[in-house]
Structure formats: C-alpha cells, structure tokens
Amino acid sequence: MSWQAYVDDHLMCDIDGHHLTAAAILGHDGSVWAQSSTFPKFKPEEITAIMKDFDEPGSLAPTGLHLGGTKYMVIQGEGGAVIRGKKGSGGVTVKKTSQALVFGIYEEPLTPGQCNMIVERLGDYLIDQGL
C-alpha cells in the first residue's frame, strides 16, 4: 500500500459523516511521505520543535505547537509517543513511530477523541510493522 493510500484511506476516513480537516505522514527529518491536499505548508523548524518535544516531553508547553504558522496549545499527551494540541474548536494529534510522524488535524464536529483514535490507530499499526 502506498503512503498516500494510508493518508487517504486510513487518516481521511469517514467517521459518522465527518473526517479530519487534514492529515499527513512525515519522516522524522520533516520529509513528506504523504499528505492530504489540505495539510498546511509547514516550516522545517516546526517539525524540529515537535521532534524535540518527543525527546524532551514538555518542551513545547511554554511556546505551543506550531504547524503551518498555526499555534496550538499543547494539552496532555503521552510523553515520547503522542503530542496533542488544541486551538478553538479544533486541534491536532501527532503520533511518533520509529521512523515517522503521523499527523491529524480536526475541527468540530469531529471530537478530539475521534482524531486521537484515527491517528493513534494508524501509528500503532506502523509501529507493529516496524515503521
């Protein structure tokens, strides 16, 4: 299966008639493996800061998580494994695997829990596959 199919079929999937606003799978170096057409154009330093928070959980808390120029308030995640951010009625979930970062961005009516489930389920699958 291509990386794009993982984004299209697994991350941008339909849940009760709704889906993520945007999604992507990136390498730890910030290289794009696949992304939805709606995924924001991000800066390399934004991915570097996200990777740093996985190594040093809490490092993004004072500044927020930035992605494509949008600032998300960092909320509880799983240190070294999942970072979650909130902005207004939406937010972002980032799951780290051994080689990739899986991103999901959502807006209401999708809930944070639904976004977490979508992103973390694919991330856990990739981890199980050694990726």
Curated annotation (Swiss-Prot):
PROSITE patterns: PROFILIN (PS00414). Disulfide bonds: none annotated. Pfam families: Profilin. It is found in: Cytoplasm, Cytoskeleton. Transmembrane segments: none annotated. The keyword Acetylation does not apply. Its main location: cytoplasm. Gene3D superfamilies: Dynein light chain 2a, cytoplasmic. Keywords: Actin-binding, Allergen, Cytoplasm, Cytoskeleton. GO terms for molecular function: actin monomer binding. Binds to actin and affects the structure of the cytoskeleton. At high concentrations, profilin prevents the polymerization of actin, whereas it enhances it at low concentrations. By binding to PIP2, it inhibits the formation of IP3 and DG. This is Profilin. It comes from Pyrus communis. The lineage of its organism: Eukaryota, Viridiplantae, Streptophyta, Embryophyta, Tracheophyta.
